[in-house]
Amino acid sequence: MEYLRIENDFPRISHSAVTLGKFDGIHRGHQKLVEKIIEQKQEGAQAVVLALGTASRTILTKEERCRILEEMGVDILLECPLTEKIRHMKAENFIKEILIGDLQVSYVAVREDFRFGYERKGTPAMLKEFGKKYGFHTEVLPKEMDGRRKISSTFVREELNRGNMEKFRFLMGTDFSVEGIVEHGRGMGHKYLLPTTNLIPPVEKLMPPNGVYITVSHFRDRSYQGITNVGHKPTVGGEKFIGVETYLFDCNEDLYGEYCKVDFKKFLRPEQKFSSLEAVSYTHLTLP
């Protein structure tokens, strides 16, 4: 999959099937839209995701978004920051200049509540009207719902901020996870029967509340259940950055330097300060 961040002009793409939105988290609603443009590849179209205006703190990192979309079959991810030009572009001009002119769109998939263009005056009805005139088809999908609430990035963020890993999993179709190279910690966990891995999440990634979670950690060809502390490691003085420290059950390996992906399953309790590392060891080993 090709990833392009739009700084000035859009690339010229021929025969594209496009879906538009923020796409900072690929939740169930986004997935339905992506599936629609993937279907158009059978007609010779390139499947293009146009992500409009990503937040400074995102549910998924750029790497995670790219991997998920590539696995789904997307050909091109265009990330378009909300520059002055884009913010003040009339919806009609957005359709003519970008969708028709630059992307040579043959198919567009959007949700029924999608809005775009200056003052958010662009609507699915407008896309359909222009499609009839300029020869592209617009498919409008209903909102994906959880009960009476629309599934949206805002909904996902709220549940993540609550530490509700089960609801996050339902909305996204996958676990919340943190991944990266295992860092060297202070080397004290092993002394107190706490073999651990340490990860530093990217600064742009939204994190759940500080606390202790049930997790599963994945390394190349093996996985370990464990518990993970998200926070400032208060027992050992407290770092100024958020750390993800995981105790792995039934693991005696030296995993420093390995690539690790930690899937969060359930919130256990808030982060708390212990009187000693011995107390930490005892508490962790006796958790249900």
What label would you give each PLM region?
Residues 2-8:
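Short acidic-hydrophobic, aromatic-tinged amphipathic segments that line or gate anion-handling sites
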Residues 9-63, 67:
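N-terminal catalytic cores of NTP/NDP-binding nucleotidyl/phosphoryl-transfer enzymes
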Residues 27, 69, 108, 168, ...:
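Residue-level signal for inorganic ion chemistry
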Residues 46-48, 76, 137:
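Residues at the starts of beta-strands that form the adenosine-phosphate
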Residues 53-134:
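N-terminal Rossmann-like or analogous alpha/beta NTP/dinucleotide-binding catalytic cores
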Residues 131-229:
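Glycine-rich, Lys/Arg-enriched anion-binding loops that position phosphate/diphosphate groups
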Residues 185-285:
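Phosphate/ribose-recognition catalytic cores of enzymes acting on nucleotide-derived substrates
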